[in-house]
Amino acid sequence: MARKRLTDLLREGQDPAEAEAEAEPSPAPASRTGRSPLTALKASLAEAERRVADLQGQLQERDAAHRAEVERLHTELEKVQKEALQLALANTALIEEVNGLRQSPPAKEPNAKFQPPQKQPLLPTYKVVPRPIQRAGEPRNNNDIPSWLL
């Protein structure tokens, strides 16, 4: 009893009902039509081959769809890369132009730019108010003579 067989060890981990089911191999099921086990095996083999062919067809269809998607994405990537290159070249040209304009003094063109008028200091303006002509010693009216001085 010290030595157990491998099948005994395997059966210990299983239910007793399952162990009995495995111990008794069942004969190949005969179909109801009275076919022999050989014809049943041939039929199941044909069914399996048909199923394999269907799955291979589905695999080929999916592979073709994936390849088409990869090709579309590849062309889109190339297009985006070309556009990015064009934008980078245009950006470089604009940067060079801006740097060139910063380094060179602006050329003065007459009538090209608006020149604001120069500021001049504001001088006070005097307005001359006309006065009636009067002789020096004569009062104009009696009302003009100050009465408080008399």
Swiss-Prot record:
Keyword tRNA processing attached: no
Protein name: Maintenance of carboxysome distribution protein B
A biological process from GO: carbon fixation
Subcellular localization(s) per the UniProt record: Carboxysome
Function: McdA and McdB together mediate carboxysome (Cb) spacing, size, ultrastructure and probably inheritance in the cell, together they prevent Cb aggregation in the cell. McdA is an ATPase that forms dynamic gradients on the nucleoid in response to adapter protein McdB, which associates with carboxysomes. The interplay between McdA gradients on the nucleoid and McdB-bound carboxysomes result in the equal spacing of Cbs along the cell length. Stimulates the ATPase activity of McdA, causing McdA to be released from DNA. Incorrect positioning (aggregation) of carboxysomes results in reduced CO(2) fixation by encapsulated ribulose-1,5-bisphosphate carboxylase (RuBisCO, cbbL/cbbS), which leads to slower growth.
Highest rank taxon of the organism: Bacteria
Subunit structure: Homohexamerizes, interacts with McdA:DNA, interacts with shell components of the carboxysome.
Record's compositionally biased regions (Basic and acidic residues): 1-14
Chief site of localization: other
Chain ranges passing through the membrane: none
The organism of origin for this protein: Gloeobacter kilaueensis (strain ATCC BAA-2537 / CCAP 1431/1 / ULC 316 / JS1)
Disordered as annotated region, ranges: 1-38, 101-150
Miscellaneous remark of the record: A type 2 McdB protein.
A Gene Ontology cellular-component term: carboxysome
Composition bias type Low complexity, residue spans: 115-124
UniProt keyword annotations, A-Z: Bacterial microcompartment, Carbon dioxide fixation, Carboxysome
Sequence ranges of Polar residues compositional bias: 140-150
